[in-house]
A protein has these predicted regions:
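Short, small-residue-biased leader/transition segments that mark boundaries at the very start
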Residues: 2-7
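Short alpha-helix carrying the canonical HExxH Zn2+-binding catalytic motif
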Residues: 10-11, 89
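Conserved alpha-helical segments that form or flank metal/cofactor-binding pockets of metalloenzymes
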Residues: 11-32
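Histidine-centered active-site/metal-ligand motif
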Residues: 12, 46, 72-73
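Helix-adjacent hinge/juxtasegments
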Residues: 25-69
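Divalent-cation-assisted or electrostatically stabilized phosphate/pyrophosphate-binding catalytic cores
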Residues: 27-45, 80, 103-149
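Histidine/acidic-rich helix-loop-helix segments that form or flank divalent-metal centers
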Residues: 51-99, 103-109
């Protein structure tokens, strides 16, 4: 149903409001691996916890939906269309603070979603490399390389 689809789309941030120490504790409790970057930046764990809760608390059996939740902050190489849509939508949503090149990225999202993914990751990695927000997650780097290589083949 349409209501069910809206509900599932909102699950991507269901663990976002948990305090940092609680995110770490819950990941440990549920046997979810925590990388060094995630331990240093626990806000990243909301995606992993959200995917876990989608399955365990909310009964989401669809692997594509759970993967879209898990990778909506970092992306991953070779994402499905749903994963790309959730990744891009999370970045370009209207309530987000103004970001560099956001209008261009929003336009790309509707004409070339792979280019939009690469553009988002370029901006994210530039921001992280500036030292503004801690370490860079390796999955974001791998995803950026994957999507820039797709665009260079054109």
């Amino acid at each position: 149903s349409a209501a069910s689809d809206v509900y599932k789309r909102q699950l991507h941030d269901c663990a976002k409001c948990l305090p940092a120490d609680e995110k770490i504790a819950r990941c440990k409790k549920h046997g979810l691996p925590i990388s060094q970057v995630e331990f240093a930046n626990p806000e990243l764990l909301h995606a992993k916890l959200g995917a876990y809760y989608a399955r365990e608390k909310y009964g989401v059996d669809d692997e594509d939906i759970r993967s879209a939740i898990e990778f909506h902050t970092t992306g991953r190489p070779a994402m499905s269309l749903l994963e790309k849509i959730v990744f891009v939508a999370d970045y370009i949503e209207p309530n987000r603070k103004p970001l560099p090149e956001i209008d261009e990225i929003r336009n790309e999202a509707f004409s070339d979603i792979d280019a939009s993914v690469a553009h988002i990751l370029k901006n994210t990695l530039t921001y992280l490399d500036s030292g503004s927000c801690g370490d860079t997650d390796e999955m974001s780097v791998r995803t950026y390389k994957y999507y820039t290589s797709l665009n260079s083949e054109d």
